[in-house]
Amino acid sequence: MNSPKDELTALLALNRIDSIGSIRAKYLYEQLGSAQEIFRNRKHLKEIITGVNQKLIDALDDSGAFIKAEEELRFIEDNNIRCLTPEHEDYPSRLRDCEDAPLLLFTLGNADLNTTRIVSVVGTRKATEYGRRMCNRLISELHSICPDVLIVSGLAYGIDAISHKAALDNQCKTVGVLAHGLDMIYPQRNRDMAKRMLQCGGLV
């Protein structure tokens, strides 16, 4: 029987193989039903699934992926990170239907990623004073109309950080989607804000 921990380790290993992108990983997962089954059957994938080549089989033979996965699992456990697969009820339903939806999402915090009202804010890193005012005004007015709105941005310089701060100042839930993972916060100046976001939203 596949234990949840063993399956998570296999998913992390699959995620670590650079030559297997999210679309191909998702396809293999859907065909075989679990990451462990992908690795168990790697020698016979050509017979089981159409479109598999030797390069993919060789990539799955990389034992280094499991070493990295075990290190990553320790970090996940030590930092109380949640790992969501597409089958998990908390996995964002809007993302699940995308062709390149990742097999794993790593989250911290208490945000509901399936809440009805989500507004994503993107903008320049070099915001003008006018841009700052308008961003603050937009989020303040959104909150007054929809108190349960979730503000999503990237926790980067400029409009990202301004939108997160405006959300926190208005008691809005806010989520930062990090390009580099949960093992670091960049820019460093946003670390304190990221900690606040864990109490009123979260990080992905």
Predicted feature locations:
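Short, small/acidic-rich helices and loops at N termini and domain boundaries
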Residues: 1-89
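Glycine-biased, small-residue-rich flexible motifs in mid-sequence functional cores and linkers
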Residues: 2-5, 85-204
